[in-house]
Amino acid sequence: MHTSPHQAGFVTIIGKPNVGKSTLMNRLVGERLSIITPKAQTTRHSICGIVSDTDFQIIFTDTPGILKPAYELQESMMHMLQHALVDTDVLLWLVDIKEKEVPPIVEKVLAQGRIPVLLLINKIDLIAGQEALESLVEYWKQKVNVAQIIPIAALQGFQIEQLLKHILVYLPAHPPFYPKDMLTDRPERFFVAEIIREQILYKYQQEIPYAVEVVIEEFKEEASLIRISAMIYVEKKSQKGILIGKQGESLKQVGIAARQALEKFLEKQVFLQQHVKVLPGWRSQNKLLQRFGYES
C-alpha cells in the first residue's frame, strides 16, 4: 500500500506590531508559548513552536513585529526577523483589516519568488458583513501576488484548522527535525523570564516595559516546589523606583501575578524572588544585548 511521505518544514509568521502574530502562534501550537499583551513590540525574540502529527511536523517561528529600528535592541529584533526568513519553507504574512500597504521586507520576499507567501487577514470578526470582507480580499488580490489569501480570526480560533491544511500543501517531504513530543526549542528558563516580563508589560505604562530585561539567575527544582530568582534590569534609576513602587508594593504585585502564571505554566508550586538592577543604556549596547541573547 502506498503511503504519503512524511512532511516537515519551517513556517515563519511576520507582520506589524500588535497584528496578532503571537495569538496566532499560540493557536497553531496549542500552547501559550508567546507573550500576548495589548502593547506593541511585545515579542523581542524569535520563538519556535512545533506542531507534530503522525505524518507531518511544522516548526513555526513567531517573530518581532516589523518596525523601523530606533535603537540597538530594535536593530537586533529586525536582524532576528530577517534571519528567520533564510531557511523558511512557507511565510505567513499577517495583516489586520485596516492595513493597506506592503512592508518592504514582504515586497522583497515576493520579488524573489522563492518562498510561498500566505496572506492572512486577521481580526475579520471586526468586519461589518460578508460584502465588506469580500471587498477586502479583492483589494489584496489586486495588490499582491501571493500563494493564497486566507481570512482568519486568531483570537477566536476561526479558520486555524483550515490554515494548517493550507500550510501542508507547501510543506516539503522530509523526516521530522525534532522529537514528536517536543513543543519548542527554547529552554524553560526562557519562558519563565518571558512570563515575568509579560506581567511587567501588563502593569506599567510608557517607557518602563520597554526598558526592562529579565534574567533568570536561579532555577532550582525541589521535591515540592521550584525556586526561581529573577534579576530585572532597567536603564535608569528613576525606572527602578517606578518599578519597585512605594514600599515595594508595585514589584510585589508583579511577583504575585508572575508566580500564579508560572505555577500554571510549570504545573508546580513556585517560590519567586525578584531583584531590580540599573544597567545604563543596555538597549543600545551590543555586548549587553549579546549577553541577553539578542543577535547583533
From Swiss-Prot:
Alphabetic keyword roster: Cell inner membrane, Cell membrane, Cytoplasm, GTP-binding, Membrane, Nucleotide-binding, Ribosome biogenesis, RNA-binding, rRNA-binding
SUPFAM superfamilies assigned: P-loop containing nucleoside triphosphate hydrolases, Prokaryotic type KH domain (KH-domain type II)
GO biological-process terms attached to the record: ribosomal small subunit assembly
Residues the entry annotates as binding GTP: 15-22, 62-66, 122-125
Pfam families xref list: KH_2, MMR_HSR1
Region described as G1: 15-22
Residue segments, region G4: 122-125
Residue intervals passing through the bilayer: none
Keyword match Cytoplasm: yes
Location(s), subcellular: Cytoplasm; Cell inner membrane
KH type-2 domain mapped to chain residues: 196-280
Residue segments, region G5: 152-154
Entry keyword annotation includes Disulfide bond: no
Principal location: cytoplasm
Region (G3): 62-65
One GO cellular component term: plasma membrane
Highest taxon above the source species: Bacteria
Protein's membrane topology: Peripheral membrane protein
Subunit architecture: Monomer.
HAMAP family assigned to the protein according to its UniProt record, in alphabetical order: GTPase_Era (MF_00367)
UniProt cross-references to NCBIfam families, sorted A to Z: era, PRK00089.1, small_GTP
Function: An essential GTPase that binds both GDP and GTP, with rapid nucleotide exchange. Plays a role in 16S rRNA processing and 30S ribosomal subunit biogenesis and possibly also in cell cycle regulation and energy metabolism.
Protein name: GTPase Era
Organism: Amoebophilus asiaticus (strain 5a2)
